[in-house]
């Protein structure tokens, strides 16, 4: 598929204060795109916007808030004149056994990752139809394979993958393209936060190669940018993820067998696993909800 120049395009990135969102905003800006940053950390968003080489601005908003996101969409269009690209990247995570999980944190992962993505699309689709633009929904390896101790995250990412695939067919005749982005464990604040828990870190290290590695962020984001330039339906931040699609039907059975052994091994320590949202992004979400 031919590339679309990003020069002069207007891109909205949610979850843009750090990690994938922050670096993606920078790389889009370096290619000439004007960037609207959305998130829950005003100081960080302002700093990111100030470092970008192209025209950029930021908005404080909770992606689960319909009215707030609709207002952001109106203001971004008023500020830049149009919107060509929306990247639904905002996300949080929590680990640990489902039975012992904090129900509030578990539900919040679903709300931010799945419902928040749908709220984002609902707010920006009208302007994307005007520009015949592109919506990239960030999913994960967790959409392809189950991961014990990460039930909320897997459920949310499986959900956004399914919803985005449905949406693609619904909006195609308007000229809007919809993509799904897949990332394995990538060196972000969220992954580093999860690794602070000894059990979660050791479980991850026992995954089969190449899923047991933490991958550098810049090459992953470069591949996401390339997917945006091509308006791709599937974007793989690590190339080997493409091959996982062909075997995903076998993975639940394999994971059930291997997972039983591994969870039994760690059973005496499972009660020690943190039940809160991980990383600075999780802390920002908790602070926002606390008022």
Regions found by a protein language model. Name each.
Residues 121, 156:
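Active-site helix of classical SDR
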Residues 97-98, 102-107:
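Substrate-binding pocket helix/loop in short-chain dehydrogenase/reductase
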Residues 61-71, 103:
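The beta1-alpha1 cofactor-binding region of Rossmann-like NAD(H)/NADP(H)-dependent oxidoreductases
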Residues 31-47:
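Conserved glycine-rich Rossmann-like NAD(P)H-binding loop of the short-chain dehydrogenase/reductase
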Residues 173-239:
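SDR active-site lid
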Residues 10, 17-18:
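Conserved glycine-rich cofactor-binding loop
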Residues 140:
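Residue(s) in the substrate-gating loop at a strand-loop-helix junction
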């Amino acid at each position: 598929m031919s590339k679309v120049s990003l020069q002069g395009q207007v891109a909205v990135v949610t979850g843009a204060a750090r990690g994938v969102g922050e670096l993606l905003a920078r790389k889009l800006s370096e290619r000439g795109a004007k960037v609207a940053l959305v998130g829950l950390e005003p100081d960080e968003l302002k700093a990111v916007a100030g470092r970008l080489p192209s025209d950029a601005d930021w908005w404080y908003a909770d992606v689960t808030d319909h009215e707030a996101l609709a207002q952001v969409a109106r203001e971004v269009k008023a500020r830049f004149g149009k919107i060509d690209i929306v990247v639904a990247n905002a996300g949080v995570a929590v680990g640990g056994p489902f039975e012992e999980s904090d129900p509030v944190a578990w539900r919040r992962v679903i709300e931010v990752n799945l419902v928040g993505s749908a709220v984002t699309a609902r707010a920006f689709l009208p302007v994307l139809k005007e520009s015949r633009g592109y919506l990239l929904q960030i999913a994960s390896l967790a959409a392809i394979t189950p991961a014990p101790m990460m039930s909320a995250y897997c459920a949310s990412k499986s959900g956004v993958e399914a919803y985005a695939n449905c949406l693609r067919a619904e909006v195609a005749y308007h000229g809007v393209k919809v993509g799904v982005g897949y990332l394995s464990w990538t060196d972000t604040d969220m992954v580093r936060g999860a690794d602070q828990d000894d059990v979660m870190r050791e479980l991850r290290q026992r995954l089969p190669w190449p899923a047991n590695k933490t991958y550098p962020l810049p090459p992953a984001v470069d591949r996401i940018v390339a997917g945006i330039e091509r308006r791709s339906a599937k974007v793989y931040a690590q190339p080997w993820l493409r091959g996982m699609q062909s075997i995903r039907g076998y993975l639940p059975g394999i994971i059930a067998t291997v997972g039983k052994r591994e969870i039994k091994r760690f059973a005496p320590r499972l009660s020690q696993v943190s039940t809160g949202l991980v990383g600075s992004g999780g802390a920002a979400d908790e602070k926002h909800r606390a008022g």
